[in-house]
Every structure is written in structure tokens, then in C-alpha cells.
């Protein structure tokens, strides 16, 4: 049994919706897996300590920024910084396959900017992106990437 871990934070419910639908899709399409959702907001809210991951994971990161335009005059990450703290904890960065970014395309250059910044900061790739809650095609696309990373076998 392979454990697929999805580390994320959801503030407006969009990322939670995507990760939940992704989990359901993965379980319906691939055999011999279990999917673990690790919601960083819950760890923080419950006062639990961060811990080292003992197996690989994929991170999901929405974009919450203030100030600047993300290109010419900077920006400041807000609300999602606990994900960065979790990834930076112990050897967690080395266990991260990569990050899936989300956001709103109306923000132009700031769309998925936090995911791009984490990619540079921690040295792992941006695996994919989706807008708002994501569409079924986004779920299928990210599931295919995860299947390749974890070397999963299709159910049928």
C-alpha cells in the first residue's frame, strides 16, 4: 500500500475542495493506495507541532499576497506562511516532490506567484496550477502527475 500525502492550506475553501476531489479521484482510479490529507491550518489551529515527513509528499499552495504587483515592486506573502514553515521544518523540503499552485488569473503576474517563490526557495518544481476551485480537467492533470511521481498502477 502506497501512501500519497497531500500537504496544503485552505483559507477560503477552494484548496480544500480541490484536494478533497483529487483524493476521491485518485482512490477511484489507482489501486493499492491510501491518500493522506495534511491541512496545515488544522495543525496550527490545534496547536500541534510540525513534524518531519517520513515519506514524499506534494504541497498545494494558494496565493495570498499584499503590496506590489509581484514583478516590479515586490509583494508580501500573507496567511499561507505556515506552509513554508512546515516545508522548512527538518528535512521536509527534501521530501517534497513539488508544489501545485492556485489562485485567481485576474491578478495577472501574481497568479500562483507564491508557488513559484516556494519553488525557488526550496528547490522543487511547480508541478501544476489551477484557478479557484479547479475543474475536473485540473484534477485529472494533477492526478496524472502524482501517478507518475508515485509510480501508481491504474485500477483497470
From Swiss-Prot:
InterPro entries recorded: Flavoprotein-like_sf, RNR_NrdI
Instruction: List the GO molecular function terms.
Output: FMN binding
Name the SUPFAM superfamilies for this protein.
Answer: Flavoproteins (SSF52218)
Domain of life according to the entry: Bacteria
Known Pfam families for this protein?
Flavodoxin_NdrI (PF07972)
Enumerate the Gene Ontology biological process terms: protein modification process
UniProt record similarity statement: Belongs to the NrdI family.
Name of the protein in question: Putative NrdI-like protein
Which species does the entry assign this protein to? Streptococcus pneumoniae serotype 4 (strain ATCC BAA-334 / TIGR4)
Its taxonomic path starts at:
Bacteria, Bacillati, Bacillota, Bacilli, Lactobacillales
